[in-house]
Amino acid sequence: MSVLYLSIHTKGGYMPHTVGYCCINTVLNKQKITTGRGMIQRTFEARGLAYVSEIVLANATDLVKIIQWNEDHDIKVFRMGSGIFPWGTKYNLHDLPNYTKIANTLRIAGELATSFGQRITAHPDHFVKLGSSKPAVVENSIKDLELHSTVFDLMGLTATPYNALNIHVGMNFSEEVAARWVAAYNQLSSNCKGRLVVENDDKAGSFSVI
């Protein structure tokens, strides 16, 4: 289980050495409790939304268990994985047969985390590049960010950096890249904008790169 230490507290103060971890709970994973169930594209296309819906509901159900486990072990920071909705940018979430159950389960997960004072964040995948010169990459990046933000909306999490969606810019600095990044950023929903933070990788003039 990867461990990190964060100091940001919900009330704006500091809480040094708050223990958290990223994505996979290796203890619960041995019990097949995970939010990372997925499928390859061929399976997605062959089995359709009914199968996807079952997978998503199982992921959401286990998220509740993970949040409770975190509280039982005094862990207050959890970076969720990105796979709760496999192939989630390829369909309307409302079209999932179990959507109502999924939404309700995610709401319970969010309420539980909030009641415990846990900070939930996410780190969308490295292919999210708002400053790309390729329109398809920008379009897919926006879709992926909005999917992450929608999950947080369903959980009732704040639309602030406290519940951050952390990304890299993914390329070296230039005025053109910056302009494209801002143009793409302006297409995001207000909740997604409110959660978005850019990681400073301390390279190429302190501009975020991969």
What kind of feature is each model-predicted range?
Residues 81, 168-170, 198-202:
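Short His-Asn-centered micro-motif
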Residues 132-145, 175-186:
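Short, electropositive alpha-helical surface patch
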Residues 6-118, 128-131, 136-141, 149-150, ...:
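Alpha/beta catalytic barrel-like cores
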